[in-house]
A protein has these predicted regions:
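Catalytic beta-strand/loop module used to bind and position nucleotide/cofactor moieties
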Residues: 48, 55-56, 69-75, 79-187
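N-terminal lobe of the biotin/lipoate ligase/transferase fold
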Residues: 1-104, 129
Length: 187
């Protein structure tokens, strides 16, 4: 972990300076997946802008239920809960909005990035971030939208089958990053 990478509810909350996104932060050392966790919170009435962050996910997943794994302390695993007041047909744009937020954050750290349609952020043609958006509706109205984000920050070694497809901030720069800072830039 980066020097002084204290990573908990308090440090994440202190790093975020927004009007509403991430004003309420839930942090866990381990969860099944941040999307599944915040979906449970949404059904219990969690408010718009609630952020769930985990150090480790035992059942992290991406699009098409692909398994997503990262060693503890290596990545950002978070999900933002939204309760938008527009038709479900427009919800897909939220994936792109989050992709743009991540891309801008990583650019602020000095990297050249691009967005690979529909849900990946890449550096040097390798994936650094994946986004999984899920929605709950009553058919006509959105009850909640969950935007899950996985960013490879201090991930030092990928499995051989992923080495030509994935990268991390530390692999691209040779330096470790404070995940609190990266979250604050994204939010």
């Amino acid at each position: 972990m980066a020097q002084n990478d204290r990573y908990n509810e308090e440090t994440i909350s202190q790093a975020i300076n927004t009007k509403w996104a991430g004003k309420t932060v839930h942090f866990a050392k381990e969860t099944d997946s941040t999307n599944s966790w915040i979906k449970r919170l949404a059904k219990e009435g969690a408010e718009h802008g609630t952020l769930a962050v985990a150090e480790f996910q035992s059942a992290g997943r991406g699009r098409f239920d692909r398994k997503w794994e990262a060693p503890e302390g290596s990545s950002i695993m978070m999900t933002l809960l939204l309760r938008p007041e527009f038709s479900p047909q427009y919800a897909s744009m939220l994936t792109l909005v989050m992709g743009l937020a991540v891309a801008q954050a990583v650019e602020e750290l000095g990297f050249e990035v691009s967005i690979k349609w529909p849900n990946d952020v890449v550096i040097s043609r390798k994936k650094i971030c994946g986004i999984l958006t899920e929605m709950g509706t009553n058919g006509v109205k959105i009850n909640y939208v969950l935007i899950g984000v996985g960013i490879n920050v201090n991930f030092k070694e990928f499995p051989e089958e992923m080495q030509d497809k994935a990268t991390s901030l530390i692999l691209e720069s040779g330096q470790e990053y404070d995940r609190n800072q990266v979250i604050s830039l994204v939010m």
